Amino acid sequence: MATAAQRRFCRCACFCSQNLYVARYGLHLRFRDEHQLRRDYGQLLRSRGCVTSKDFQQLLEELEQEVGRRRRLGQESAVRKALIASSYHPARPEVYSSLQDAALAPEFMAAAEYSTSPGADLEGLLQRLETVSEEKRIYRVPVFSAKFCQTLLEELEHFEQSDMPKGRPNTMNNHGVLMYELGLDDPLVTPLRERFLLPLMALLYPDYGGGYLDSHRAFVVKYALGQDLDLGCHYDNAELTLNVALGKDFTGGALYFGGLFQAPAALKETLEVEHVVGSGILHRGGQLHGARPLCKGERWNLVVWLRASAVRNRLCPMCCQKPELVDDEGFGDGFTREEPTTVDVCVLT
């Protein structure tokens, strides 16, 4: 399996102009300039409370700042990663060792082992997973042992409390950790994808590139009182997603799922899914979803966006056009300049 060191990964240029999230209005916006913003979203923004000239000017400044942040993101992330690698002293250095079987739940290992066995099929795999929704193709399986969840949380909290620089985990969450910057991509997330998730996803989602996953973006998000409490409805920049609840003690914060983002009335009927510490939810990246408000405690989740360049090189899932490639750090957003392998995938238009 190729790694970021062996291949050059890219992002789509739309990252700096599309899907800019404004939490207080609950909107993802496309932004190029003030004229375009007024033309495309003026009426909608007014209906969401952006009424006065001061409101609009504040929004305009926020969007310009976010575009600037995104343009600098790759370079600044590389600088943070280098500084962390040279100066940070882990509390639990064992989590930086190569992924050990002892860190994984027996159910997860058994499901992955079955998936690589001769004659393995979807029916047999589903006997080893919990089907949360057959219609929405959402599944759950224990991923990490309780001990490993605790150890990883201790390390994440130690890093959070350190004076090391920290990047936002994604464009919607404000609190969390990028696994790439912390140095946990190579020892933890990459083997998790290559050894275990790839065979599982190949059987569960062959029509979404499950057998061709060659990169990822992994981050931990933190929800707590006085910080991020909930998460607005969105879809992921991924073919497939793993979302693992790490802890701690909390109430509320359930995930909710609608339909695929391309489908009409995608949020007409939603499904709520409670978190189970140590277990992961598997779903399609294009499935609309969000998180209900946290009621008390702290919730930490590891989210892995799983990407297949053979799929996304054809069509960027964020702008729904052929990607305009820009070189990026690490795995970028999972695009490559190579001619993609022919893969039969399900795409709604």
Swiss-Prot record:
Belongs to the OGFOD2 family. This is 2-oxoglutarate and iron-dependent oxygenase domain-containing protein 2. Transmembrane segments: none annotated. Disulfide bonds: none annotated. Binds 1 Fe(2+) ion per subunit. Its EC number is 1.14.11.-. Fe cation binds at residues 234, 236, 289. Coiled coil: none annotated. GO terms for molecular function: dioxygenase activity; iron ion binding; L-ascorbic acid binding; oxidoreductase activity, acting on paired donors, with incorporation or reduction of molecular oxygen. Residues 214-308 form the Fe2OG dioxygenase domain. It is an enzyme of class 1 (oxidoreductase). InterPro entries: Oxoglu/Fe-dep_dioxygenase_dom, Pro_4_hyd_alph. 2-oxoglutarate binds at residue 299. Its cofactor is Fe(2+); L-ascorbate. Keywords: Dioxygenase, Iron, Metal-binding, Oxidoreductase, Vitamin C. Pfam families: OGFOD2-like (PF25238).
